[in-house]
UniProtKB/Swiss-Prot annotation:
Gene source species: Gibberella zeae (strain ATCC MYA-4620 / CBS 123657 / FGSC 9075 / NRRL 31084 / PH-1) (Wheat head blight fungus)
Function: Involved in the small subunit (SSU) processome assembly and function, and in the 18S rRNA synthesis. Required for the early cleavages at sites A0, A1 and A2.
Keyword Ribosomal protein included in the entry's annotation: no
Residue ranges of the region described as Disordered: 1-98, 266-291
Residue stretches of biased makeup (Basic and acidic residues): 64-82, 276-288
Family from the record: Belongs to the ESF2/ABP1 family.
Gene name per UniProt: ESF2
Residue stretches of biased makeup (Acidic residues): 11-29, 44-63
Localisation per UniProt entry: Nucleus, Nucleolus
The name this protein goes by in its record: Pre-rRNA-processing protein ESF2
Domain RRM: 118-208
GO molecular function: RNA binding
């Protein structure tokens, strides 16, 4: 029998050394962040079965995702958290909400934003345009905070409806508040005296914009102006009401006075008539009491037959007869 060239004990030692090193390519690749090589069994049964390969691929992908997640979490833990900076600009540039009541703190914070805001005046509102439609048309040119549109006279609306016209509400003029002055100025420069545009078949396509930037004018000035107009209107109404009540009282007083004077006149006439009838009765009594005496003319004496006529009478009578 020939002697063996290889030493079995040396081969066993080498294998033990390799096991002590413990190199694992998959673990190394995971630590480096790379993708581990897929393991495939050399056995004929595993090669013939395709389901085993799919299952091994799924397991490898799941382990790879878990490793990536753990690495990302480790990186986040290693990085120190940065303190959040309080942004002063956001609190100062934002205008206060219209629906909320302004507290003292919010009022102080909104003063800077109010100074930066700008107001645009619309001298004419297209017929039957609502505030929501106006906001949608002007919103692309800048951030809008508040809109106020003055409604038409109720009497004119009632006349239009009675005549068979449109029943929708219309507005005569309006004010739009932008959060930035430059946006308000740019809107006026860009859109003033130009058509509203949009789709050709839209209702407001051919209407013109009438925009004017109010320099130095703020929203509180508008509210003060509206409050002053309302106060003036109410004071004028109170003055008219007091005047009408005064006239009504004067009219009632004059009517009562006229009735009183008429009653006094009727009483005076009745008294006078009564006095006249009383005096007439007294005169009748006095006439009845006094005897009337009339001076009578003496009667002519009848001529006697024996008396002679004068000579002249006889002579005239003789000439006649």
């Amino acid at each position: 029998m020939a002697p063996e060239t290889k030493n079995d004990f040396l081969e066993i030692a080498d294998s033990d050394a390799d096991s002590d090193i413990g190199y694992n390519s998959e673990e190394d690749d995971m630590q480096k962040g790379g993708r581990g090589a897929k393991r495939r069994k050399v056995e004929s049964d595993d090669e013939d079965d395709p389901g085993s390969d799919i299952g091994s691929d799924d397991e490898d992908e799941a382990t790879e995702k878990d490793s990536k997640k753990t690495q990302e979490e480790d990186k986040k833990e290693d990085q120190p958290e940065k303190p959040k900076r309080k942004s002063k600009d956001t609190t100062s540039t934002e205008l206060p909400d219209v629906t909320r009541t302004l507290t003292k703190k919010n009022l102080v914070a909104s003063e800077a934003a109010i100074k930066k805001s700008g107001v645009v005046y619309l001298s004419r509102i297209p017929p039957f345009m609502k505030p929501a439609k106006l906001r949608s048309l002007l919103e692309p040119y800048g951030t809008i905070n508040r809109i106020f549109l003055a409604p038409e006279d109720p009497a004119s609306h009632a006349r239009r409806v009675r005549a068979g016209g449109n029943k929708k509400r219309s507005y005569t003029e309006g004010w739009v508040e932008f959060t930035k002055k430059k946006d308000a100025k740019a809107v006026c420069d860009l859109l003033n005296a130009r058509t509203i545009g949009g789709k050709k078949g839209s209702y407001y396509h051919d209407d013109l914009w009438n925009l004017l930037y109010l320099k130095g004018f703020k929203w509180h000035n508008l509210t003060e102006q509206i409050a002053a107009e309302n106060a003036e209107r109410s004071s004028r109404m109170r003055a008219e009401i007091s005047k009408s009540t005064k006239e009504n009282k004067e009219f009632v007083r004059n009517v009562e006075k006229a009735k009183m004077l008429d009653g006094m006149a009727v009483k005076a006439k009745a008294k006078k008539r009564k006095a006249e009838t009383h005096t007439e009765g007294q005169e009748d009594e006095s006439v009845r009491q006094v005897k009337r005496s009339f001076k009578q003319v003496p009667l002519a004496k009848k001529k006697m037959d024996g008396e002679d006529q004068p000579a002249e009478v006889t002579r005239v009578l003789s000439k006649i007869f």
